[in-house]
């Protein structure tokens, strides 16, 4: 794998690969496979040793917002398959703990927990494991999509709210939170509690996020445990 300054792929795409439709392959599956084969980020992730193209999203967000500092403690919610955990380790975090309901293959240097981050004792458990509270809580989680935009939007907002309230318990003063949301209007309901507890709140859509996708990332920095009183 290349070093911490790995950059996303640039330049024109290569030859477009088209797949013949197999009898047992659905149209949606056919479309997904064709897109994967022609996605430069998928190819670059494989070539550079990242477990998913999503690694480039965190690389871009970190380059822009300075989320991962040397020696920091990082929690990766919904860590599978481990791409964001890899990036955090490669960029100098001292302690990285990934949590997911699914099993995740080991990432050198990181601790991976198969469990539910929403368990009441999880923030305290992770704080004890890391030797202190986190400097960054990050989430690239998304619920299973239904194809109905409004439903999918509300589902990810609810999931991100859970991640945000986890971060309130898990973050050290001055810490940061980054999470994926889908655009659709209701993401604004996240802003008020975030503005109460963080010094700055921004939205960003990395270049590696597919143009047709409604996903964007909310980035909050300067955590204030006591809200505006701090």
UniProtKB/Swiss-Prot annotation:
<feature type="binding site">
    <location>
        <position position="84"/>
    </location>
    <ligand>
        <name>S-adenosyl-L-methionine</name>
    </ligand>
</feature>
<feature type="binding site">
    <location>
        <position position="140"/>
    </location>
    <ligand>
        <name>S-adenosyl-L-methionine</name>
    </ligand>
</feature>
<keyword id="KW-0698">rRNA processing</keyword>
<keyword id="KW-0808">Transferase</keyword>
<dbReference type="InterPro" id="IPR050082">
    <property type="entry name" value="RNA_methyltr_RlmE"/>
</dbReference>
<protein>
    <recommendedName>
        <fullName>Ribosomal RNA large subunit methyltransferase E</fullName>
        <ecNumber>2.1.1.166</ecNumber>
    </recommendedName>
</protein>
<keyword id="KW-0963">Cytoplasm</keyword>
<comment type="similarity">
    <text>Belongs to the class I-like SAM-binding methyltransferase superfamily. RNA methyltransferase RlmE family.</text>
</comment>
<comment type="function">
    <text>Specifically methylates the uridine in position 2552 of 23S rRNA at the 2'-O position of the ribose in the fully assembled 50S ribosomal subunit.</text>
</comment>
<dbReference type="GO" id="GO:0008650">
    <property type="term" value="F:rRNA (uridine-2'-O-)-methyltransferase activity"/>
</dbReference>
<feature type="binding site">
    <location>
        <position position="82"/>
    </location>
    <ligand>
        <name>S-adenosyl-L-methionine</name>
    </ligand>
</feature>
<dbReference type="GO" id="GO:0005737">
    <property type="term" value="C:cytoplasm"/>
</dbReference>
<dbReference type="InterPro" id="IPR015507">
    <property type="entry name" value="rRNA-MeTfrase_E"/>
</dbReference>
<feature type="binding site">
    <location>
        <position position="100"/>
    </location>
    <ligand>
        <name>S-adenosyl-L-methionine</name>
    </ligand>
</feature>
<keyword id="KW-0489">Methyltransferase</keyword>
<feature type="binding site">
    <location>
        <position position="116"/>
    </location>
    <ligand>
        <name>S-adenosyl-L-methionine</name>
    </ligand>
</feature>
<dbReference type="InterPro" id="IPR002877">
    <property type="entry name" value="RNA_MeTrfase_FtsJ_dom"/>
</dbReference>
<feature type="active site" description="Proton acceptor">
    <location>
        <position position="180"/>
    </location>
</feature>
<dbReference type="Pfam" id="PF01728">
    <property type="entry name" value="FtsJ"/>
</dbReference>
<keyword id="KW-0949">S-adenosyl-L-methionine</keyword>
<dbReference type="InterPro" id="IPR029063">
    <property type="entry name" value="SAM-dependent_MTases_sf"/>
</dbReference>
């Amino acid at each position: 794998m290349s070093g911490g300054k790995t950059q996303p792929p640039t330049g024109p795409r290569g030859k477009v690969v088209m797949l013949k439709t197999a009898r047992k392959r659905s149209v949606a599956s056919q479309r997904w496979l064709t897109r994967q084969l022609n996605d430069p980020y998928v190819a670059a992730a494989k070539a550079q040793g990242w477990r998913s193209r999503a690694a480039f999203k965190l690389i871009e967000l970190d380059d822009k917002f300075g989320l991962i500092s040397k020696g920091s403690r990082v929690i990766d919610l919904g860590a599978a398959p481990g791409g964001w955990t890899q990036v955090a380790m490669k960029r100098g975090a001292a302690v990285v703990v990934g949590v997911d309901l699914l099993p995740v293959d080991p990432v050198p240097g990181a601790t991976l927990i198969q469990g539910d981050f929403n368990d009441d004792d999880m923030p305290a458990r992770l704080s004890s494991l890391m030797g202190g509270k986190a400097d960054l809580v990050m989430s690239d989680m998304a619920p299973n999509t239904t194809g109905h935009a409004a439903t999918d939007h509300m589902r990810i907002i609810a999931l991100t709210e859970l991640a945000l309230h986890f971060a309130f318990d898990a973050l050290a003063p001055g810490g940061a939170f980054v999470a994926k949301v889908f655009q659709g209007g209701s993401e604004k309901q996240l802003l008020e509690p975030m503005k109460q507890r963080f010094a700055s709140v921004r939205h960003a859509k990395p270049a590696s996020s597919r143009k047709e996708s409604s996903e964007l990332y909310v980035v909050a920095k300067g955590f204030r445990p006591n809200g505006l009183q701090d």
